[in-house]
Amino acid sequence: MKNVGQWGIYVNERSLSGQTFENVREAAAAVETIMNEFPQAQGLFHELRGDDLRNGVIANASYSGVITLSNSYFSRTEDGLNRTYDGTTAKGLHPAGTNKSHIATHEAGHILERALIDKHILSKGNGLLTQLAGADAWRKATMSGKVISEACRLAKKTPAGKGMKNDALIKSVSSYATMNRAETLAECVADYVANGANAKPLSVAVWSVLKRELG
């Protein structure tokens, strides 16, 4: 493994050897962008690696801070991966305005939830029960649920979000955002990084909450 970047991101070169370099480079850069934005999450991203993921999964993030890129998808040419991802945005599966670079941005968004668990749960102690509580919060998307609830309230106070129900705010980001609150948070992060102030009102609100908590 090779340590790259000022935050100590480990790139598992052997596991990524069959993937297209530019696709991997873009993913690593996307993750570092998030780490730059959120100092409290810097020590929680431990590894970028490749693996054979189940059919249809482009990438994933684990509680242990590992982001895994699918060998099947990231071994494609840049244009090939672009076409695949653009097909998902055309269907509304992922936020409009995002591209293949935001695959890793989405996964880094999950690591931000892990940082919230560290801040609000694991910081209370290092005993077994505390560790179990942290893992349970990850499994149940407890912290992302709290972020989304607050962000929905904030979004409804804006002209763009006024009068919208929570479900409508979430669905406006993407259909994938409706899966669960962890995916809502990650999709909002990708939406904001891609579109900035022009992102959906919920995404703008989620970003503001995360910046307050972890920035």
Regions found by a protein language model. Name each.
Residues 2-215:
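Active-site-flanking segments in enzyme catalytic domains
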